[in-house]
């Protein structure tokens, strides 16, 4: 049997899973990851905790599976993207806490660049909007604020990387300073047209070229683990950012195929084929590059509050005792009774990109109940997904035929039925909803030569298909009501 090890580094946990090449999960181990909030809007991780947690997970998962590390054909890595790590090249020691993708400390810098009229240039080269979300402004902040860091970086003593780079450096015993093309595309320093680090963007953000990792295809081979670290020299065979890995794990290999991952937030990603999509609301990014093949691009929609809206019903309002109760409560009424909830609790993402938007509950009457608000919260997740997909359809010129889903909230049958009704296309839930981890394993399988995309596509198995049951006129009527409420929320904090 061929074994594949998937290393999945999330925002709140570290996880390692051992798979058979068939996609069967054999053993898994996880550790929580602490988040640090030194100032309002700041979010940090300890890179050493990331590394030590992953090492413990790898050791535990391999032991649970009862195999020797030497039996593993390939390691795949997937990770929270954009999170920025700097470390000393010689010792491998971190020089600052990692600045997490959620961190907003560089808002003034990105706003200033917008005011200088630079967003169109950045968008054309990277597919991304000028926003603190991405790595470039975070790295610029570190170079400016950490004493002596810029000078050391210019002397070649400092490495920068996203979390995949950090883990590869540590796993290889300091031999591999690499990243994959999907993670590079989230830094705002990588040109998605020329497929190179962009010299003009490096000058704009004042980043020394020598601190950047080498960029490789997603299954191109990334060296080997150190025998001292992992117990054997294992091929690091596949790497992708978490959302790209989930798209791959869902078998979305053809243009127009899309997946939505429902977690605290939600990410909707559509395969857009061999050319970047162009549109106002959706981000254009690189999905992956396989050996001997052209780069595959993707369109992405970011939804900041999805499952977190249900969490707010529980913790903020006390309407439910736990997240699982929301489905039963929402199903106790046939609709939301005209109640809308725009969960702009930390701004709105795709396609609005408004950090100043704030939450709105509208349409309340004397007959409104907590069940109506619970249903409105589920509808809010589905409406936001609809908005993101419409932006992607406009950018790609491709009409969505079905949506594959994963993540924790994909267990909510009512949510998925509402989603199908509002989209007007089937929503498909696979048997395995750990698509991110599985996608990293599949990329490792391709890199190790034990899998190909046709074998992966054949392994995708349906758990349940949700068919739309709502008339188009009713769907559009509900969406107009949603858009009216969104307009109320936009710019609220600024105005």
Curated annotation (Swiss-Prot):
Glycerol binds at residues 81-82, 133, 242-243. InterPro entries: ATPase_NBD, Carb_kinase_FGGY, Carb_kinase_FGGY_CS, FGGY_C, FGGY_N, Glycerol_kin. Inhibited by fructose 1,6-bisphosphate (FBP). One of its GO terms (cellular component) is cytosol. Its EC number is 2.7.1.30. Pathway: Polyol metabolism; glycerol degradation via glycerol kinase pathway; sn-glycerol 3-phosphate from glycerol: step 1/1. GO terms for molecular function: ATP binding; glycerol kinase activity. It catalyses: glycerol + ATP = sn-glycerol 3-phosphate + ADP + H(+). ADP binds at residues 11, 15, 264, 307, 408, 412. Sn-glycerol 3-phosphate binds at residues 11, 81-82, 133, 242. GO terms for biological process: glycerol catabolic process; glycerol metabolic process; glycerol-3-phosphate metabolic process. Keywords: ATP-binding, Glycerol metabolism, Kinase, Nucleotide-binding, Transferase. Disulfide bonds: none annotated. ATP binds at residues 11-13, 264, 307, 311, 408. HAMAP family: Glycerol_kin. Belongs to the FGGY kinase family. Key enzyme in the regulation of glycerol uptake and metabolism. Catalyzes the phosphorylation of glycerol to yield sn-glycerol 3-phosphate. This is Glycerol kinase. It comes from Citrifermentans bemidjiense (strain ATCC BAA-1014 / DSM 16622 / JCM 12645 / Bem) (Geobacter bemidjiensis).
